[in-house]
Amino acid sequence: MELNGVEIEDTFAEAFPIKISRILITAATKRWATVAAQEATGFGTSVIGCPAEAGIEKYADASETPDGRPGVYIQFCTFGFKSLEEQLLERVGQCILTAPTTAVFNGLPDAEKQFDTGRKLKYFADGTESETEVGGRKMHVIPMMEGDFLVEDTLGAVTAIAGGNFFIFGDTQMTTLTAAENAVDAIGAVDGTITPFPGGIVASGSKAGANKYKFLKATANEKFCPSIKDKVEGSEIPADVNCVYEIVINGLDFESIAKATEMGIRAAVAVPGIKKITAGNYGGSLGPHKFNLHDLF
């Protein structure tokens, strides 16, 4: 099938289960909420080499937050609840508590799984901590040099989905980059999803394992590398394609990732010079969740 004259390959993106925690950071200004969110989600591109995948989900107006201040929702993703709890404690403690004017609220208050992250962070106050209530939520108050840091008693987590994806094939690097940027912007409007790679874009799509260097668990996906398309047997790169970017999507449920994939692809194919959209899968061996591209439209 074609969308806006661009081929949409009849294939599927293969995704897998992941544990996700979602939190809300508020601050005196949107700038400082954003700074804290960016710091907390750093080194969070891929579980191939990072302790968690992480990203900004969406911004919240002051009218939408428990303390009436600008906010940012972020997500952290790991394979197990134990490692997720560890990442929450470390990232909130080192990257958000340390940032000016911030507070942290539970982004999944109805989740069955709740971590006592706030209850543990209160010990930083070394006996000067107290409790209060904000918007009906139990908060721990930690006195600090600038004033008080507030963190909700518990932070929730759920079993969700990671690894939704699609590939954008373009005639030039700048054309393809523009399409990828537009795709990420469109996905940003879909609640419950993040694009964890830098700026939401993967420049270095990988394959599982290695052909030559067996000590590596992931290596360059040479069949999708345009600069060696004439040298690699079975290259997936057409003659008129000179750049490929991958968009990876994690989310709280199947429906939100499906919607994000659709919105992202629609935005990408609106850019002149885009030649093809496809997706990455391992024939069903990676995970149970399949996002068939043709079914999205």
UniProtKB/Swiss-Prot annotation:
In which pathway is this protein known to take part? One-carbon metabolism; methanogenesis from CO(2); 5,10-methenyl-5,6,7,8-tetrahydromethanopterin from CO(2): step 2/3
Query: What SUPFAM superfamilies has UniProt attached to this entry?
Result: Formylmethanofuran:tetrahydromethanopterin formyltransferase
Transferase recorded as keyword: yes
Taken from the UniProt entry, a GO cellular component term is:
cytoplasm
Q: What does it catalyze?
A: N-formylmethanofuran + 5,6,7,8-tetrahydromethanopterin + H(+) = N(5)-formyl-5,6,7,8-tetrahydromethanopterin + methanofuran
Q: Where in the cell is it found?
A: Cytoplasm
Q: Name one GO biological process term.
A: methanogenesis, from carbon dioxide
One GO MF term attached to the UniProt entry: formylmethanofuran-tetrahydromethanopterin N-formyltransferase activity
The UniProt entry, under Pfam families, shows: FTR, FTR_C
Where along the sequence do coiled-coil regions lie?
none
Predominant location category:
cytoplasm
Record's function text: Catalyzes the reversible transfer of a formyl group from formylmethanofuran (formyl-MFR) to tetrahydromethanopterin (H(4)MPT) to produce 5-formyl tetrahydromethanopterin (5-formyl-H(4)MPT) and methanofuran (MFR).
HAMAP family, per database record: FTR
* Sequence similarity: Belongs to the FTR family.
- The name this protein goes by in its record: Formylmethanofuran--tetrahydromethanopterin formyltransferase
Provide the species name.
Methanococcoides burtonii (strain DSM 6242 / NBRC 107633 / OCM 468 / ACE-M)
The UniProt gene name for this protein comes to ftr
